[in-house]
């Protein structure tokens, strides 16, 4: 009865884990409250509408367009830097900026920032992968595209189909390409370029959007320093040349604004999503022959900056009000952007007409006034209890210590005071004073609104915490009884759980979590060495007990096996440098393999693919002849089908063997299943990570030669899952998510399949260790297997609650969206998929099909 009760207790605890996640997430990631409707010019002070300088916009959006790609001396954008005998930027035809892109630096949130001017929700990180999702649409939100559409303009778009998902039915002509086939460097861009010559001849569009993906795909597959990168930069530069030439030659394009920008950058590993300098510093250029009259002169190319802040740095959200103003459109209601001051010169600074309080006046002043009133409306909507009446100014602004909202109030009062004091005085000095006051207010308001805490649902946060706490209480006492029987190992596990839980409240430790697992695993090796130094033996694994004949090795290991285990851990630690502090340090995959490629390919030699002539008259020759000339997609599908058949066979054979009570052979079904799974995981891993599976083999062979207890086997499995995840380049940053293998064998997009393959490719090493540890535990009885699940559940529930508690306590922390929120998303993946699906449900599947 006690065993049955314990079983139901653990089942309930594992059900409570996803429930707690759903409840907590609904309070932690609420949809933002936005102002409804669309902006109009009716709200402009004095009724003055600043005239548009341009009537068309051509946006060239280059995914992963870091600032140094355009501005540095090593850039491939030669035409962008050089125009004839001079320089495009130096001539003033292009105004260069670095546009700061706040985290999360993935495409969908950044496109929302560029088109609405607002700071996107962190939940868009998930929606960025779910391409079929429609909840992220901007169809009913105020954007500069919607304003153009309302004005009667036609929009065309070619490239990343994220635009089609954000703006369904808005484009007059469009041809979208999925952004996740990252192995494609050429077709995704050629599909855009082929439309350009014809579209440049058309005069019916008001906005022409081109979104190129090639740079981003090269970065994901080979990193930002790939030799393919400079070639792709030359290709993008040729597109700039084509467009700019058309602006000069085509009459209907004389009043067209050309904007070249990136949605995000990329880190040294070739990924993005986080907040490193490389990820948050894309380039931004406003290009038009009209800008030459401003007589702006900038050096180009320029010296390199380690922080990538070339020229003047603006916020990416500033693009929205700037485009709206230059095109003569109302600024979208929810925009937090500030009109870029350098472009105000497109209106006459010295215009002298009549007082600013009347219906006319310097257009640049009215542009900033419109921007200020729009942003003031957003501030009032978020802080309804604060008044912006001028009469309150002496009371509030006399204080020496002001909070952010009070600084915004005082800045607005300063604007009103300056406007009222100017009266009929409309000379250049008065205009400059008003501009300064307006820009001060705009920057303060932008800072306030961009950093304002989300509207958390605290009740749901606390309920989610309580549910996870209840899951811990359900598993604590069953696990305690198990751990007490194995005191040293139990104390070690308890210490690691408490240490980890405490560590989650420090942002630096969260960023460098891999260090915790590396050190704790080395401590575990020391423990195993002290306990089992005298128990290494030369017998086969079958005689030692744990593997029970299910492991295909019969090692003869001496007493120094623990030392070899420690060395292997050290190798894994340097396999991929991850985290933030040491990410740029030399490692095996980034430093050794690139300079010793013969070593890598010796480990990965695939004669059938690279040298089919070496097959000779072997039995594989017919296979090579059959697949000769076949599309690579079908190659991948054939391999996946073969792997699937082997897995099905191993499961069926295991069930049949249990039914017929046949004896065990050298290759029992459980081993076949594991080896087949290994083949699949190799397919889903980066090429440079594949040799690490050999290190895993060495480790599991050593561990199989020890007489580990039930608890020790569980702790070993748990530690290895986390250690190898970070050894393969994982971290707590969104930018470490690898999508380079998310489309293996897939011809069309499927959110479920792509999501599953993305998880498998990033958790390939932990999945391997879950399977390998089952072979290690194959001699365990039912109670021992349930004890294994109990300990894992206690560990996962405690980790989940500690991360939830940290996110709740530190919800107003500066790094809540760059450190703690990504950590929470990773914890969801660890709990929902790795723990429940791979560990718990996988254990049930193993017991159903494999003979114990």
UniProtKB/Swiss-Prot annotation:
Keywords: Endoplasmic reticulum, Glycoprotein, GPI-anchor biosynthesis, Membrane, Transferase, Transmembrane, Transmembrane helix. It comes from Aspergillus oryzae (strain ATCC 42149 / RIB 40). Pfam families: Phosphodiest, PIGO_PIGG. GO terms for cellular component: endoplasmic reticulum membrane. One of its GO terms (molecular function) is CP2 mannose-ethanolamine phosphotransferase activity. Belongs to the PIGG/PIGN/PIGO family. PIGG subfamily. It is found in: Endoplasmic reticulum membrane. It is a multi-pass membrane protein. Its EC number is 2.-.-.-. This is GPI ethanolamine phosphate transferase 2. One of its GO terms (biological process) is GPI anchor biosynthetic process. Ethanolamine phosphate transferase involved in glycosylphosphatidylinositol-anchor biosynthesis. Transfers ethanolamine phosphate to the GPI second mannose. The chain crosses the membrane at residues 458-478, 486-506, 516-536, 632-652, 676-696, 714-734, 750-770, 787-807, 824-844. Pathway: Glycolipid biosynthesis; glycosylphosphatidylinositol-anchor biosynthesis. Glycans are attached at residues 191, 420, 576.
